[in-house]
Structure formats: C-alpha cells, structure tokens
C-alpha cells in the first residue's frame, strides 16, 4: 500500500480531492514556523518602538533578539538625526510678504517661528535684529525671521515697531508690540531670550529673569543712595 504521507504527485491529487487527509507537518517544521512567527512579532515590536522605548524594554528581550534590537535602534537613531538636521536653521533670515505663507504657516510641524517686523532707521529695531541673530545661532531648532513691516503688512504703523510675532504650527502663540514692551534701548539679549522662552519659542538655560536682576540692582542702588542722603542730612543737623 502506498504511503499517504509520501510526497508524490498522485497523493497531492488525492489530497486536493479530499480523499487523503492533509499532509501532517513534522514537529520540527512546526517549531521552525513558530520561531519565525515569534521573530516577526519581535521585529514588528521593534519597528513600533521609539528610541526611548527600546532603551526601557532592553532587559525584556533575549540574547537572540539583541542583533535585531540594535539594528532597529540604529535605524531609529538615523531617522531622528535626519529629522533634526532638516529642522536646523541657525540664522536670522530676511523674508518678504510673498514668503510669509511658506516660511511661517508652512514652517513644519512643531517648528517655532519668531518673526520680527522692523523698519530701517529705528535704533531699537536694529538692536533686536542683533539679538535675534545671536539667538538664532544659539537655538537652531527654532526659525528666526525678519521682515520690513511695510513689505509684510501694508500700512503697518511705525508706532508699533518693533514687533515680534511667535508662531507654532501656523498659529500665533505670542506677540510683542511696540518699544515699551521691550524696555527701550536697554534691552539685553538675555532679556529677549527670557521673553521668548516664556512663549515657548526657545528652551533657555537661564535660571531666572535677567530683568529681575537689573531691577534688584536698581532697588539696591536707590536704597544705598537714600541711606547716603539721610546720613548726610543727619550730619548737617549735628553741625
């Protein structure tokens, strides 16, 4: 009698007709198939994980999985670096009104945009442009732009200059309008950095508002001056 499990063309025909039962899968083949499915499952898990998740779950994987895990970690790291490189700016860029939609509204998901409306001949505008150029180099992940007010917004009043608009994902998150908001020509780069950090545009390493330090120094100076004046009056009375 012919072996029903034999790999013959006739047996294959009988199996298709339902005369013979399906061929039994050897135990070793079943185990290999299960290992393959498990491996695919592990790979899919790696693909779905972020770099942080790979680090957190590293101890849960067996030694056999280390190569696959390292491969996907490197892949994720390369993708992250590529994404970071795409979002590096590092300079204060001049734009016109025609560039506004592309440079601001379509800057990219999660990109902070700082736009300075200015006009030549206004000293405070020039000072802020200097500060922004410095901050653009310090915070290359944020986009720093400048535009002559009349080319960006027709008939924009000069009394509102300088003006800073802060955007993210095409939405305005903060605005600073007019010279009084900036404190005049005494504005320092650290003060401007702090203001922008409060809006979320940059992540500052400053531990406290530099304006507060100036105010504290000013108050100390006033108190010292008042004490000196009072001591002088007391000396005059004694004479």
Curated annotation (Swiss-Prot):
Residues with Phosphoserine modification: 41
Q: Which GO terms describe its molecular function?
A: protein folding chaperone; vascular endothelial growth factor receptor 2 binding
Annotated Gene Ontology cellular components are: cytoplasm; endoplasmic reticulum; perinuclear region of cytoplasm
For whether the record's keyword set contains Cell inner membrane, the answer is no
Changes seen on gene knockout: Morpholino knockdown of the protein causes significant inhibition of angiogenesis.
Q: In which tissues is it expressed?
A: Expressed in endothelial cells.
User: Where does the Phosducin domain lie?
Assistant: 28-201
SUPFAM superfamilies (UniProt xref): Thioredoxin-like (SSF52833)
Q: What main location does UniProt list?
A: cytoplasm
User: Where do Polar residues bias regions lie?
Assistant: 217-227
Where, subcellularly, is it found? Cytoplasm; Cytoplasm, Perinuclear region; Endoplasmic reticulum
Q: Name one GO biological process term.
A: apoptotic process
Which CDD domains does the protein's record reference? Phd_like_VIAF
Q: Is this entry keyworded Cytoplasm?
A: yes
Q: Where is this region: Thioredoxin fold?
A: 89-239
Query: Disordered: where is this region?
Result: 16-37, 217-239
Which UniProt key words apply to this protein?
Angiogenesis, Apoptosis, Chaperone, Cytoplasm, Endoplasmic reticulum, Phosphoprotein
Oligomeric state and partners?
Interacts (via thioredoxin fold region) with kdr/vegfr2 (via juxtamembrane domain).
- Family membership, please give it: Belongs to the phosducin family.
Q: What does this protein do?
A: Acts as a chaperone for the angiogenic VEGF receptor KDR/VEGFR2, increasing its abundance by inhibiting its ubiquitination and degradation. Inhibits the folding activity of the chaperonin-containing T-complex (CCT) which leads to inhibition of cytoskeletal actin folding. Acts as a chaperone during heat shock alongside HSP90 and HSP40/70 chaperone complexes. Modulates the activation of caspases during apoptosis.
- Give the protein name, as stated in the record: Phosducin-like protein 3
Ranked from the top, the taxonomy reads: Eukaryota, Metazoa, Chordata, Craniata, Vertebrata
């Amino acid at each position: 009698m012919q072996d029903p499990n034999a790999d013959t063309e006739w047996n294959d025909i009988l199996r298709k007709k339902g005369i013979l039962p399906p061929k039994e899968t050897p135990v070793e083949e079943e185990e290999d198939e299960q290992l393959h499915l498990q491996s695919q499952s592990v790979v899919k898990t790696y693909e779905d994980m972020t770099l942080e998740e790979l680090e957190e779950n590293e101890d849960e994987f067996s030694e056999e999985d280390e190569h696959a895990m390292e491969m996907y970690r490197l892949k994720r790291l390369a993708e992250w670096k590529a994404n970071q490189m795409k979002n590096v700016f590092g300079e204060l860029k001049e734009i016109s009104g025609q560039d506004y939609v592309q440079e601001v509204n379509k800057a990219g998901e999660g990109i902070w945009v700082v736009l300075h409306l200015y006009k030549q001949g206004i000293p405070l505008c020039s000072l802020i442009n200097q500060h922004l150029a410095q901050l653009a180099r310090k915070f290359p992940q944020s986009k720093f732009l400048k535009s002559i007010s009349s080319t960006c917004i027709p008939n924009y009043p000069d009394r509102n200059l300088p003006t800073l608009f802060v955007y993210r994902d095409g939405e305005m998150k903060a605005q600073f309008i007019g010279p009084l908001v900036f404190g005049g020509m005494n504005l320092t780069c650290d003060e401007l950095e702090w203001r922008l950090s409060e809006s979320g545009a940059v992540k500052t390493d400053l531990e406290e508002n530099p304006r507060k330090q100036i105010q504290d120094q000013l108050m100390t100076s006033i108190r010292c001056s008042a004490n000196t004046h009072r001591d002088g009056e007391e000396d005059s009375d004694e004479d």
